[in-house]
């Protein structure tokens, strides 16, 4: 982090808790608090060890969330890039998958914000997708986000949620229903719209509708 301490800029190194290789970073909350107690946080500094310093889609999204300027460096080439909040919004379709930043729940939140101007609550994910698969949390979180389960006789409407089991036990994936298709973001794929096929129908365990 970059701090303003008594009028002088100071670099404050923080631990990275992310378990994913070079895909994203998670600043240790304890280090963040220490930095905040040391001075005013005025910027975020991080590296792209194996890629150019140009901001990734995840960088742009996280920069907006942080409301701070970002400084990105490739330590091998010593090239820098600068990024600041500018109102960037990731496209709903074709976005890259990054756990906790642009994943299936992120897509649902962004769709509801863009299409219905509804701000759905975000939920703190486990550090890794593997931890999440051991105890999928979105099903129990949905009830506290304003959704109710559809009755068997109710037909799907645009914007309804489909909780699915994809390749692993438990309802570990969420998709949006839209005009007979689904809009969703599977792990390590680009977000897309595709037909609500027989396979996806078999994967579906619960259907929910926003009720708040």
Question: Locations of the language-model features?
Answer:
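Active-site-adjacent structural segments surrounding the nucleophilic cysteine of cysteine proteases
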Residues: 83-95
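Short helix-to-loop capping/linker segments positioned immediately adjacent to catalytic or ligand/cofactor-binding
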Residues: 92-100, 150
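Active-site nucleophilic cysteine motif
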Residues: 97-115
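Glycine- and charge-enriched low-complexity intrinsically disordered segments
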Residues: 194-212
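Conserved beta-strand scaffold positions in the cores of enzyme catalytic domains, especially
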Residues: 44, 70-72, 182, 207
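Short acidic alpha-helical/loop segments enriched in Asp/Glu that coordinate divalent cations
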Residues: 117-129
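...with weaker cross-activation on analogous glycine-rich loops/strands in unrelated enzymes
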Residues: 126-192, 196-197
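Conserved beta-strand-loop surface patch within small alpha/beta domains used
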Residues: 1-41, 49-86
């Amino acid at each position: 982090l970059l701090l303003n301490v008594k009028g002088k800029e100071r670099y404050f190194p923080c631990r990275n808790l992310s378990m994913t290789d070079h895909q994203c970073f998670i600043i240790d909350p304890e280090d963040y608090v220490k930095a905040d107690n040391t001075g005013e946080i005025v910027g975020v500094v991080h590296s792209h060890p194996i890629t150019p310093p140009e901001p990734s889609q995840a960088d742009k999204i996280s920069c907006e969330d942080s409301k701070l300027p970002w400084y990105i460096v490739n330590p091998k080439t010593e090239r820098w890039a600068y990024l600041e909040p500018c109102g960037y919004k990731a496209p709903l379709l074709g976005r890259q998958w990054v756990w906790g930043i642009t994943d299936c729940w992120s897509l649902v939140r962004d769709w509801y914000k863009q299409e219905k101007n509804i701000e759905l609550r975000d939920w703190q994910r486990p550090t890794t997708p593997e931890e999440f698969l051991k105890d999928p949390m979105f099903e129990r979180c949905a009830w506290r986000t304003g959704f109710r389960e559809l009755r068997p006789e109710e037909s799907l409407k645009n914007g309804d949620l489909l909780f699915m089991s994809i390749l692993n036990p438990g309802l570990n994936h969420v998709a949006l229903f839209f005009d007979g298709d689904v809009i969703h973001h599977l792990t390590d794929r680009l977000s897309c719209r595709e037909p609500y096929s027989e396979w996806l129908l078999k994967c579906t365990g619960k259907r929910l509708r926003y009720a708040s």
